[in-house]
C-alpha cells in the first residue's frame, strides 16, 4: 500500500516591512515634490464672461478716443479656435470703411496679439489710392458660423489700455480688462496639450460638443472637477493632475521597495520619479 508523502509547505514570500526610515523618506520626498509641483502653478483668475457671435458677417463696431488710438488688439477666446474675422477701420463716423484684411484668432484660453499698426501699414502699401484711415473706428466682422470672445483688450502706442467709448454696448467683452497680463506665459494661458484636454473639460461642464475625443475621458473628467471647484483658470485646470502626481508617490515608493527590498534604492526610485 502506497502512501502519499505530505507536501512540503511552500514558504510564502517574505513580507516587506515598511520601516520608520521608509516613512520619513517618503514624507520628505512627498513634501519636497509638493512644494515644487504646487508652486506657481498658474493664475487663480482669468476672464470668464463671453460675448457670443453666431451667423456669418455678425460685426462688432467700436469707437476709440482720438488721443488714444489702438495699435494692438489682445484677445482671449473660447471654446472655438481659429475664428476668422474681417477687420475694417475709418477715421470719422461719416467715412466709408477701409478693409485692412483678415485676422485669425487661434488658440483657446490663450492671450494673443494682433498688430493693428502692421495691418494698417500693409493696407496702405497695397492701396492704389491715398489712404488716410486710422483706427479711431474699428469693425470686426465674423466670417465663421460661430465665435465666442471672452475678452478684448486694446493698447495704444504707449502700451496703455484704451477702452472703446461704446464699450457699454458690449458689456461682457470689456468687463475683465483688469485681468490682462503684462506678459503672456503659462501663468495666464494654456500651453502644450492643455488646448485639447483642459478645453474638453470646459466643454464637459458646459454640455458642449467635445473637441478632443481620441483619449479616454476619465482624465478630462478629473480636470473638469478641478475647473468646477477653482474656476476656468490655469490653476483650476492644472490642480487635479498635480494632486494625482503627488498621490502616486507612495505607490512608486512601495513598488521600488518591493522590487529592491532596499530602503535607499526605493527612496532613489521614488525621488527620480
Which residues fall in each region the model found?
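Short helix- or helix-capping micro-motifs
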Residues: 266-273
Amino acid at each position: 500500500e502506497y502512501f502519499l508523502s505530505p507536501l512540503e509547505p511552500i514558504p510564502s514570500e517574505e513580507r516587506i516591512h515598511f520601516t520608520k526610515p521608509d516613512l520619513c523618506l517618503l514624507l520628505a520626498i512627498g513634501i519636497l515634490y509638493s512644494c515644487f509641483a504646487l508652486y506657481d502653478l498658474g493664475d487663480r483668475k482669468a476672464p470668464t464672461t463671453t460675448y457670443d457671435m453666431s451667423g456669418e458677417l455678425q460685426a462688432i463696431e467700436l469707437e476709440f478716443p482720438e488721443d488714444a488710438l489702438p495699435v494692438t488688439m489682445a484677445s482671449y477666446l473660447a471654446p472655438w479656435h481659429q475664428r476668422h474675422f474681417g477687420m475694417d477701420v475709418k477715421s470719422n463716423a461719416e467715412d466709408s470703411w477701409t478693409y485692412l484684411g483678415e485676422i485669425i484668432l487661434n488658440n483657446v484660453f490663450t492671450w494673443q496679439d494682433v498688430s493693428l499698426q502692421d495691418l494698417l501699414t500693409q493696407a496702405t502699401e497695397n492701396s492704389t489710392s491715398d489712404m488716410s484711415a486710422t483706427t479711431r473706428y474699428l469693425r470686426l466682422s465674423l466670417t465663421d458660423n460661430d465665435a465666442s470672445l471672452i475678452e478684448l483688450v486694446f493698447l495704444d502706442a504707449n502700451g496703455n489700455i484704451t477702452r472703446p467709448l461704446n464699450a457699454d454696448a458690449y458689456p461682457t467683452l470689456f468687463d475683465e480688462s483688469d485681468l490682462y497680463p503684462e506678459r503672456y506665459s503659462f501663468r495666464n494661458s494654456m500651453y502644450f496639450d492643455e488646448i485639447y484636454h483642459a478645453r474638453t473639460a470646459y466643454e464637459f461642464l458646459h454640455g458642449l460638443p467635445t473637441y478632443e475625443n481620441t483619449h479616454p475621458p476619465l482624465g478630462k473628467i478629473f480636470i473638469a472637477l478641478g475647473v468646477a471647484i477653482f474656476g476656468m483658470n490655469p490653476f483650476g485646470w492644472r490642480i487635479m493632475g498635480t494632486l494625482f502626481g503627488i498621490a502616486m508617490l507612495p505607490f512608486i515608493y512601495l513598488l521600488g521597495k518591493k522590487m529592491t527590498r532596499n530602503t535607499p534604492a526605493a527612496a532613489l526610485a521614488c525621488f527620480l520619479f
